[in-house]
From Swiss-Prot:
GO terms for cellular component: cytoplasm. GO terms for molecular function: nickel cation binding. Keywords: Chaperone, Cytoplasm, Nickel insertion. UreD, UreF and UreG form a complex that acts as a GTP-hydrolysis-dependent molecular chaperone, activating the urease apoprotein by helping to assemble the nickel containing metallocenter of UreC. The UreE protein probably delivers the nickel. Required for maturation of urease via the functional incorporation of the urease nickel metallocenter. This is Urease accessory protein UreD. It holds the Pfam family UreD. It is found in: Cytoplasm. Its main location: cytoplasm.
Length: 299
């Protein structure tokens, strides 16, 4: 927010696969971008497999009620991209309280991803911290063509627990919709809607007073056989070793979902990073190289 006016930051990204100039047998991905304040794209990096890593910077330092963010990503055929954030996103206590909005206005983010055939996109923002009284909602829509792969991992902290802060009347809402174009038309792969608030945070059948929630989703490029899925889930459960929190995972018709509830953002990120590496192996891709912007990485 600037002055009394809320932000509406917009970021549009296009990923394009091209042949490497120094090796005609290799492909790399380049990008085109257009952003409005407070969004800014920092310098892109290339992974060993030619994947384009794009760090997205939110220069305002946080969100308050009424602020809006819009992210649109188009991944061209056979492109490979990883979009992350430069720092944790903060959602401050809400403003704009009125008779119509007694708890204040919501900060919001809309993300739309379009993946062409054989595209591979990883959406891996850093932690989101909802301050006391903060209101945040997001909607993510993913459109996949055949053999496209989409992977997302998000970690949310409800309240600044280190400062003894609770969520109070704050809340976090999320809607994720993934559909794929098939020979018989558009098929839904996942529709996932969540809301976390103080009641859910305190309820033993909800968050059980644990302040951190994480969600990992992978829409695979091809259906996984029963044997491959069984092995993947078994390995993901083994990967929970020596990490704090409650962790569970399950298969989709064509992919995987994993959830984390616990005290540690670092534990959530470490588990998801291990699963991320498993999915790279199944896609016959290089071992993930965590973006340099991420803190607290495993050795």
């Amino acid at each position: 927010m600037t002055g009394d006016r809320p932000w509406h930051g917009q970021c549009s990204l296009q990923l394009i696969s091209k042949t490497a100039a120094d090796d005609l047998q290799s492909q790399l991905t380049v990008h085109q971008s257009q952003c409005t304040a407070p969004f800014k794209i920092q310098r892109a990096n290339l992974d060993d497999d030619g994947r384009c890593q794009l760090p997205l910077l939110h220069t305002a330092g946080g969100l308050v009620g009424g602020d809006q963010l819009s992210v649109n990503v188009k991944a061209g055929a056979s492109s490979r991209g990883l979009v992350t954030s430069v720092a944790a996103q903060k959602v401050y206590g809400s403003v704009g309280r009125s008779k119509q909005h007694p708890k204040g206005l919501w900060a919001s983010q809309e993300c739309h991803f379009e993946l062409a055939t054989n595209a591979d996109l990883e959406w891996l923002p850093q932690e989101l911290v909802v301050f006391q009284g903060g209101l945040y909602k997001q909607r993510m829509q993913v459109e996949l063509q055949p053999k496209a792969s989409f992977l997302s991992a998000e970690v949310v902290r409800l309240g600044r627990t280190a400062a003894g802060e609770t969520l109070n009347e704050g809340a976090w809402r999320s809607s994720l919709e993934i559909c794929r174009q098939t020979p018989i038309g558009r098929q839904w792969e996942l529709v996932d809607q969540l809301e976390l608030n103080s009641d859910v945070l305190q309820n033993l059948h909800g968050m059980g007073r644990q302040p951190v929630f994480g969600s990992f989703v992978w829409a695979a490029p091809d259906p996984l056989t029963a044997e491959v899925m069984e092995t993947l889930l078994r390995n993901c459960r083994t990967d929970r070793a020596n990490l704090e929190g409650s962790m569970a995972c399950g298969g989709l018709d064509q992919g995987l979902v994993a959830r984390y509830i616990g005290p540690s953002s670092q534990a959530a990120r470490q588990w998801f990073t291990r699963i991320w590496a498993r999915t790279r192996q199944l896609r016959r891709l290089s071992t993930p190289q965590p973006p340099r912007e991420w803190p607290l990485q495993e050795e």
